[in-house]
Amino acid sequence: MEMRNVKGTKDYLPEEQVLRNKIKRACEDTFERYGCKPLETPTLNMYELMSYKYGGGDEILKEIYTLQDQGKRDLALRYDLTIPFAKVVAMNPNIRLPFKRYEIGKVFRDGPIKQGRFREFIQCDVDIVGVESVMAEAELMSMAFELFQTLNLEVTIQYNNRKLLNGILQAIHIPTELTSDVILSLDKIEKIGIDGVRKDVLERGISEEMADTICNTVLSCLQLSIADFEEAFNNPLVADGVNELQQLQQYLIALGINENTIFNPFLARGLTMYTGTVYEIFLKDGSITSSIGSGGRYDNIIGAFRGDNMNYPTVGISFGLDVIYTALSQKETVSSTADVFIIPLGTELQCLQIAQQLRSTTSLKIELELAGRKLKRALNYANKENIPYVLIIGEEEICTETVMLRNMKEGSEVKVPLSSLSNYL
């Protein structure tokens, strides 16, 4: 049998997983500093839930992994963490609002594979339910900047409002049944350009006259400020969108992050669930062209799941761990899983005890030579693993309660008392 991975999946060896764990910890620490509570939801869901009309829309349905259990029930692997979160809130009406949760977990999409994009991947999500104010969006955007600052990645956030975009299409008389198709085309404008948008809408069955209207509208809007849209399009949805965008902009200025954000009137976030603010996060250096995070406001899903059709104001943000890992792996050197490597020279029993003592009395990560390698080979291993310090312990060191401390970076050695070892590290 040929040993190979399923297309779109990957094994992460220890030197890779160390960096991935660092990203997870940075996410968890940042999320918790913003008052978010952890949540875990099942990977396996009812197909009916994952294909719900308020979810990802027709485009996502093509990418869902489906299966049946032994009871012939139709199931699906989750394609995001948003719909499972909405399900949890709908099933638990006693959850106190506002509710801020985070979840880090695997999701699955049978879609195209490219740099930093796989079919099995990890999303790191934060969602807030119970807040109508766009202050929630501003806080999530601020949190994103803080996270990427922690990871030493410079980013910009593009943002828009679906009310503005829907209102523009309404004002130029795009039929309601075609709105979703046009939005999906406009969402690609930065990748395919205005000519590509025209071709895309034509392929979706939109008339040439309507395609010309759409493209001319796009070109006329590119230089407009947020305030200009209300005058350019006499439409109540446009007015609502402008109002929310102006409020958001005020919060971004107050937080000192407005200069790192860009208003993009045709950013759509293709998913049909969004009802207000939408945003996408990009690396400033452009080393990865796709977004490394995204999100927005979706006020209808939880009410639809509960069956009361009430608005439950909800906004979220999602970070792609795999694409962040790809960005960081191009910049960071491999870090070690251990701070100290202990090499016994005929003192295995005592070194086992010393390793245990150091683990229990310090925060150091300790690795003990277990394979019985000679000193030269053991030092070579520590060097290749980027372990910064090695303790060499023979009979003499045991008798004098000392250790030979080797600094692997400098290549220097010094004998130090075991009791004060931490002072030398």
Curated annotation (Swiss-Prot):
One of its GO terms (cellular component) is cytoplasm. PROSITE patterns: AA_TRNA_LIGASE_II. It catalyses: tRNA(His) + L-histidine + ATP = L-histidyl-tRNA(His) + AMP + diphosphate + H(+). It comes from the Bacteria. GO terms for biological process: histidyl-tRNA aminoacylation. CDD domains: HisRS-like_core (cd00773), HisRS_anticodon (cd00859). It is found in: Cytoplasm. InterPro entries: aa-tRNA-synth_II, aa-tRNA-synth_II/BPL/LPL, Anticodon-bd, Anticodon-bd_dom_sf, His-tRNA-ligase, HisRS-like_core, HisRS/HisZ, HisRS_anticodon. Its main location: cytoplasm. One of its GO terms (molecular function) is histidine-tRNA ligase activity. It holds the Pfam family tRNA-synt_His. Keywords: Aminoacyl-tRNA synthetase, ATP-binding, Cytoplasm, Ligase, Nucleotide-binding, Protein biosynthesis. Its EC number is 6.1.1.21. Homodimer. Belongs to the class-II aminoacyl-tRNA synthetase family. HAMAP family: His_tRNA_synth (MF_00127). This is Histidine--tRNA ligase 1. The gene is hisS1.
